[in-house]
């Protein structure tokens, strides 16, 4: 009982803290215990330690810790990537010598594939350019998506990169670069997840989820066979035990746990890795499911937060939309917009928020036509970047797929964009 309790407690603790760290900031979990724990661990607890240190050491300890923490959290470094690599390799080193002789040829074949795939996709996720935007790639990234006039508006410049920001892009404060179709910065791959490597990231999640589930189940089967070879009446789940064995006292719940512990102690290394795999499997599958859901919705982690911010604005009132030109004849400002993009649709609406809660005045010269309509729910807003699950998948796995033919000319006027870049640099200097 002691062995199984310690191993399970440690693994559950690590898994739960990882879940809180990764999911605590999600808009869907706002005002929940998970969000509260995230704020407690990452905001209130550090502030409390800072207050105590200021009282006892005049802040010397927290100054050093803050410098270290700033480097760990806000600078690009491979610490967590190395940890993830070691977690995979050390776990397999402890697991395989005991488990491998028990595998059939089929399990050895598919097991080898399951072991290798996470390493391949980890390398591709970490070392593939996520879609960094610079002077050489700016034209290409501008032609990737049109502005939707809801989350992304033309004419916004990055104050760090001195470039007009393409639609769906974001500047990463860790990588210090703008990234096309930015999803998030992932510390496990020491890289941003963007337009060019999101496919490898999803395949990394899928292969890791399969590996943990496959390895955990096979380890469970081996442990069960070992216990049942000596105690035939033992079953994997206590409620599967025969009524006769349960009623006779040969296998009550306490004895069932003792036999579990005995099975783990006969191969502690493999048993510990099996428990780690089984207990982390829901976390990995949940993360995979979340990212597939984002693909289904035609959005990203970054954009989902923007949508939730819009919902908060709608709850307060003062959000309005109106349609763009129905025939797509809107005249574009080619100084800040691409003439064409590879995307199959153009913006159908513009959405804005007003400070006074009243519709925008005509003097504001905002694009669109017709009357302004108050918006209270996200489902009343069209997501330009959701073109159906299949096409969304194509966009992720074939990031340069042309959904429509090019116009035979550059999507942007290089001279106009060059002037705009020059103005941006002068403003920031």
Swiss-Prot record:
GO molecular function terms here? protein-cysteine S-palmitoyltransferase activity
Q: What is its EC number?
A: 2.3.1.225
A Pfam family of this chain: DHHC
Q: Which reaction does it catalyse?
A: L-cysteinyl-[protein] + hexadecanoyl-CoA = S-hexadecanoyl-L-cysteinyl-[protein] + CoA
Q: Where, per UniProt, does this protein localize?
A: Endoplasmic reticulum membrane
Domain DHHC span(s) in chain numbering:
156-206
Provide the leader sequence positions.
Answer: none
- Which ranges make up the Cytoplasmic topological domains here? 25-79, 134-201, 296-429
Q: What does this protein do?
A: Palmitoyltransferase that targets several endosomal SNAREs. Palmitoylates the SNAREs at cysteine residues close to the cytoplasmic end of their transmembrane domain. May have a role in the cellular quality control of transmembrane domain-containing proteins.
Name under which the protein is recorded:
Palmitoyltransferase SWF1
Please report the organism this UniProt entry assigns to the protein.
Neurospora crassa (strain ATCC 24698 / 74-OR23-1A / CBS 708.71 / DSM 1257 / FGSC 987)
Q: Name the encoding gene, please.
A: swf-1
């Amino acid at each position: 009982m002691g062995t199984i309790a310690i191993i399970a407690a440690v693994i559950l603790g690590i898994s739960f803290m990882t879940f809180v760290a990764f999911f605590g900031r999600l808009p869907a979990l706002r005002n929940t215990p998970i969000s509260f724990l995230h704020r407690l661990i990452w905001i209130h607890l550090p502030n409390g330690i800072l207050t105590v240190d200021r009282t006892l050491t005049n802040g010397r300890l927290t100054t050093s810790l803050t410098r270290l923490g700033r480097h760990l959290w806000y600078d690009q470094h491979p610490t967590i990537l190395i940890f993830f690599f070691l977690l995979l390799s050390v776990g397999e080193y402890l697991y395989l010598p005991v488990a491998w002789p028990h595998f059939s040829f089929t399990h050895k074949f598919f097991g080898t594939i399951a072991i290798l795939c996470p390493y391949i996709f980890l390398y591709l996720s970490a070392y593939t350019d996520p879609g960094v935007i610079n002077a050489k790639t700016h034209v290409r990234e501008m032609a990737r998506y049109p502005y939707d006039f809801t989350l992304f508006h033309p004419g916004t410049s990055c104050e760090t990169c001195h470039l007009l920001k393409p639609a769906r892009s974001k500047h990463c404060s860790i990588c210090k670069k703008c990234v096309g179709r930015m999803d998030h910065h992932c510390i496990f791959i020491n890289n941003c997840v963007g337009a060019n490597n999101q496919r490898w990231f999803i395949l990394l999640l899928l292969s890791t989820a399969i590996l943990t589930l496959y390895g955990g189940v096979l380890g469970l089967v081996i442990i069960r066979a070992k216990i049942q070879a000596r105690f035939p009446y033992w079953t994997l789940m206590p409620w599967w035990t025969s009524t006769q064995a349960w009623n006779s006292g040969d296998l009550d719940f306490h004895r069932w746990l003792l036999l579990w512990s005995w099975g783990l102690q006969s191969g502690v290394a493999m048993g510990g890795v099996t428990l780690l795999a089984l207990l982390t499997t829901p976390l990995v599958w949940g993360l995979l499911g979340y990212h597939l859901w984002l693909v289904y919705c035609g959005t990203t982690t970054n954009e989902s937060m923007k949508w939730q911010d819009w919902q908060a604005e709608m709850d307060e009132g003062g959000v309005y939309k109106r349609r763009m030109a129905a025939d797509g004849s809107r005249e574009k400002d080619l100084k800040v917009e691409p003439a064409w993009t590879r995307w199959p649709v153009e913006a159908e609406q513009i959405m804005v928020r007003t400070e006074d809660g009243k519709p925008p005045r005509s003097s504001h010269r905002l694009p669109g036509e017709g009357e302004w309509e108050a918006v209270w729910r996200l489902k009343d807003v069209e997501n330009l970047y959701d073109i159906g699950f299949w096409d969304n998948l194509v966009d992720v796995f074939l990031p340069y797929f042309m959904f429509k033919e090019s116009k035979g000319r550059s999507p942007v006027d290089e001279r106009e964009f060059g002037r705009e870049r020059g103005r941006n640099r002068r403003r920031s200097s």
